[in-house]
């Protein structure tokens, strides 16, 4: 069943309790054996999905009323989708074409793909497919991007606790998409901060998915307007929705990795409003 999240404005958000904030923006329990776990956000109509095939070959539309939720005859009739495997070895079949995904490999599936299935090579070490889908009006090319083939951009420094590598997968410099962009940021041991100085992008929303968070550790994800911030305490393999008006930054009790996904008006990465760190409140 689709979990529907409606849009929230920044004025109402200021009055949210901790419980309300988590219910509105946090996505938990994405990986359930042989199930499709979908969350539909009305912010730019992005859908976040988790699939963990264990004993079955799992279809993308399993348990989803496609007409009720999308008004189409199949999931990707008017959508594109990007996914990462954050588990064991797995296979994705798209309209009869097989794609092998290892750990941290990425697959972009273009608009119009009708039949998409998932399976794991080893039920004892199942694949975990984390994916985000955005509306699309045109088709490009379904493509597998291995972690080794991602565009890599080292940033930050140990002195500022944010030494990291940004891996660009579904990105204009790597392949063409309708509006979806996705990548993976890996923090080095000893670094804990991401996306600081913080920013917003008025014409795009973003979803963060935190993983490789060690046991008994958490990430404090910062959100809200720069002048009135809030936080959500997040555990391993959880995602969080970030509306266009909200910052999206985080600090962990250890280093970690996160996948970012964006959709909206454009794919211009410099179309953002940076907030000086000393001006945050």
PLM region descriptions:
Residues 87-126, 132-135:
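Acidic, low-complexity central loop/insert segments
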Residues 123-164, 224, 259-281:
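Double-stranded beta-helix
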Residues 101-121, 233-254, 263:
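Conserved metal-binding segment of the jelly-roll/cupin
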Residues 75-102, 211-236:
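A short beta-strand-loop-beta hairpin characteristic of the jelly-roll/cupin
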Residues 1-48:
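Non-cleavable N-terminal signal-anchor transmembrane helices
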Residues 53-54, 89, 215, 247, ...:
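Short, glycine-/Ser/Thr-/acidic-enriched flexible segments
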Residues 40, 44, 176-239, 243-247, ...:
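Acidic/His-leaning functional-site neighborhoods
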Residues 28-69, 163-206:
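A short glycine-rich, His/Asp/Glu-containing loop-to-beta-strand
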């Amino acid at each position: 069943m689709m979990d529907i999240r409606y849009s929230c404005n920044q004025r109402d958000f200021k009055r949210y309790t901790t419980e309300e904030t988590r219910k509105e923006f946090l996505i938990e329990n994405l990986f359930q054996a042989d199930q499709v776990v979908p969350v539909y956000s009305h912010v730019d109509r992005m859908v976040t999905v988790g699939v963990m095939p264990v004993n079955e070959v799992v279809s993308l539309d399993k348990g989803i009323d496609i007409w009720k939720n999308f008004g189409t005859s199949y999931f990707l009739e008017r959508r594109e989708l990007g996914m990462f495997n954050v588990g064991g070895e797995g296979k994705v079949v798209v309209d009869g074409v097989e794609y092998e995904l290892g750990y941290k490999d990425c697959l972009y599936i273009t608009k119009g793909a009708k039949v998409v299935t998932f399976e794991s090579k080893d039920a004892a070490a199942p694949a975990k497919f984390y994916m985000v889908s955005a509306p699309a009006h045109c088709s490009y090319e379904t493509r597998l991007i291995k972690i080794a083939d991602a565009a890599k951009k080292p940033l930050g420094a140990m002195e500022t606790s944010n030494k990291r590598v940004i891996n660009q997968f579904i990105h204009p410099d790597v392949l063409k998409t309708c509006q979806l962009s996705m990548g993976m940021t890996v923090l080095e041991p000893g670094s804990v901060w991401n996306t600081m100085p913080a920013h917003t992008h008025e014409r795009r929303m973003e979803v963060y998915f935190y993983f490789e968070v060690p046991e008994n550790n958490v990430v404090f994800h910062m959100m809200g307007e720069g002048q009135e911030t809030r936080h959500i305490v997040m555990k391993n393999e959880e995602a969080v929705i970030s509306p266009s008006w909200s910052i999206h930054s985080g600090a962990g009790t250890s280093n970690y990795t996160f996948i970012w996904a964006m959709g909206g008006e454009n794919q211009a990465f410099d179309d953002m409003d940076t907030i000086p760190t000393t001006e945050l409140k």
